[in-house]
Amino acid sequence: MSNNIHQELNSNVEDAEQSDFRKGVVDWIKHNNPKDPGFLLPQTFMEVGSEQVLDFLREWQYKVWSSGYLGMAWPREYGGQGMSRQFQQIADEEMKKARVPICFNVIGLGWAGPLIIDTGSDFEKQTYLKGILTGDDIWCQGFSEPNHGSDLGSIQTRAERDGDEYIINGSKIWTTMGNFAKYMIL
């Protein structure tokens, strides 16, 4: 067996710490899974259709984050737990199994946040990351354009420098989560 395959197999086996963590997640879900809110919960972030649903999901996301089960691989100084991604994967797996509500800020959590962590300035990290995790600052994506959809190679929108700022020129046909977002990733 080659070293790479051996390492890959070992990385898929939980150690005692991860196993204990999984048990803790399952126990937390058992005691914190919210009661029926009286309306149909969305299965994806694109199904969030009202302020009532948004408020419910925002409260849930805050609870998940404040309990330490969201942003686990994000740096501590910006609201994360500073742990390995495997712990976040375990928490996500158990939440999916238990069919708990979604953490709806998917564009912030999956795109904007990691990009800011990897390439952002300290100011940007301080300004944006914690709000993404708590659900206070919702992000949307602004890629789709008339006649091009989300074909990033055909985007006509341009950012033009104007002194210390950039002016964004272009048009969009829909903006996923745009009706609730505070920030947009382009």
Predicted regions and their residues:
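Amphipathic, small/basic residue-rich leader segments at the start of a protein or domain
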Residues: 1-106, 124-127, 131-134
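Short, solvent-exposed loop/turn elements at beta->coil junctions and helix N-caps
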Residues: 77, 144-148, 173-174
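N-terminal glycine-rich flavin-associated loop
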Residues: 104-123, 149
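Adenylate-forming
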Residues: 112-116, 142, 183-186
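A short, Trp-centered hydrophobic/proline-enriched beta-strand micro-motif
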Residues: 135-143
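Hydrophobic, small-residue-rich alpha-helical packing segments that form membrane-like cores
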Residues: 148-151, 166
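A short core secondary-structure module
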Residues: 156, 164-165, 169-186
